[in-house]
């Protein structure tokens, strides 16, 4: 039997306040929103990051938190229903509302967040890409913490393997598997640092849509790479030629990112 690392079983409940359990899973998402909100406020407060480009004020960032959070929840759930398990939810339509049972799609959440951004931009009379660039710059914070939460739960584990760091996950049978949640956390964490470096050090926020495009390309490539190690959803399996739904949904994301980067560089950076 190959050497495996013992899975560090962690109580999913951090603490209980009376009858209310506080779960690591929920805490990770809340922390992602709060830290992302704080970093977004930092971005818009620094005029030098934006040059002469129109940027939202701090009040807009507070609204942006609400709009994107709702968009991620609604879009993530609907994306999972449509892309990953439509047959089940057609037979059990009321289960669509049972969010506590799990089942969220990043790509659906991304679409939902995009809709939220567009609605807020229209309401406040701001350029959509100004808000989109902010969301893209902070999104990897939540993605990193979310993948750590997937590992703690545990869920979304990897494929069977004999690598020295393989783990046997509770509920995933007796085979050692890739800790693919940690791979995704690392990739999305690295993406965060890349975006921070590009946005803050190289002035990417001065080019409308550049940060959004870089995020789309970076996340799409990281997701496709990590899908080679992640166990596909059991109700879908492999679609064709070893491809998974996560891979296919990431391809248009990369294409959109490339288009945005090209758009950003066809326009002059806005000087201070």
UniProtKB/Swiss-Prot annotation:
Q: Where does a 1,2-diacyl-sn-glycero-3-phospho-(1'-sn-glycerol) bind?
A: 147
Q: State any GO CC term.
A: plasma membrane
EC annotation from Swiss-Prot or TrEMBL: 2.5.1.145
Q: Does the keyword section mention Cell inner membrane?
A: yes
Where does the chain cross the membrane?
A: 24-44, 64-84, 99-119, 125-145, 185-205, 209-229, 245-265
Keywords for the protein's UniProt record, in alphabetical order: Cell inner membrane, Cell membrane, Membrane, Transferase, Transmembrane, Transmembrane helix
* Superkingdom of this protein's organism: Bacteria
Query: Which top-level enzyme class is recorded in the Swiss-Prot or TrEMBL entry?
Result: transferase
Named from the GO MF annotations, one term is: phosphatidylglycerol-prolipoprotein diacylglyceryl transferase activity
Give the membrane topology. Answer: Multi-pass membrane protein
Which pathway is this protein engaged in?
Protein modification; lipoprotein biosynthesis (diacylglyceryl transfer)
* Pfam families cross-referenced by the UniProt entry: LGT (PF01790)
Is DNA repair among the key words of this record?
no
Name the GO terms of the biological process aspect.
lipoprotein biosynthetic process
Location in the cell reads: Cell inner membrane
NCBIfam families, per the entry: lgt (TIGR00544)
Protein function: Catalyzes the transfer of the diacylglyceryl group from phosphatidylglycerol to the sulfhydryl group of the N-terminal cysteine of a prolipoprotein, the first step in the formation of mature lipoproteins.
Family named by the database record: Belongs to the Lgt family.
- Can you say what this protein is called? Phosphatidylglycerol--prolipoprotein diacylglyceryl transferase
């Amino acid at each position: 039997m190959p050497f495996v690392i013992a899975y560090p079983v962690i109580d999913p409940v951090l603490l209980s306040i009376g009858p209310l359990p506080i779960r690591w899973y929920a805490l990770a998402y809340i922390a992602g929103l709060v830290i992302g909100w704080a970093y977004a406020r930092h971005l818009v407060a620094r005029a030098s990051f934006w040059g002469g480009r129109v940027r939202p004020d701090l009040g807009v960032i507070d609204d942006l938190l609400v709009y994107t959070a709702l968009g991620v929840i609604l879009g993530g759930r609907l994306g999972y229903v449509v892309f990953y398990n439509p047959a089940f939810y057609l037979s059990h339509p009321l289960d669509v509302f049972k969010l506590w049972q799990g089942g969220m799609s990043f790509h659906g959440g991304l679409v939902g967040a995009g809709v939220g951004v567009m609605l807020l931009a229209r309401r406040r009379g701001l350029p959509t890409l100004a808000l989109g660039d902010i969301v893209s710059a902070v999104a990897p914070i939540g993605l990193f913490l979310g993948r750590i939460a997937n590992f703690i739960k545990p869920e979304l584990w990897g494929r069977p393997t004999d690598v020295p760091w393989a783990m046997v996950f509770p509920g995933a049978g007796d085979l050692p598997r890739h800790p693919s949640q940690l791979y995704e956390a690392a990739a999305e964490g690295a993406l965060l640092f890349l975006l921070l470096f590009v946005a803050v050090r190289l002035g990417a926020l001065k080019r409308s849509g550049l940060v959004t495009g870089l995020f789309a390309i970076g996340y799409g490539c990281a997701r496709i790479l990590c899908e080679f190690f992640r166990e596909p959803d059991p109700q879908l399996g492999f679609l064709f030629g070893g491809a998974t739904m996560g891979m296919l949904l990431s391809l248009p994301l990369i294409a959109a990112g490339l288009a945005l980067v090209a758009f950003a560089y066809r326009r002059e950076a806005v000087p201070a």
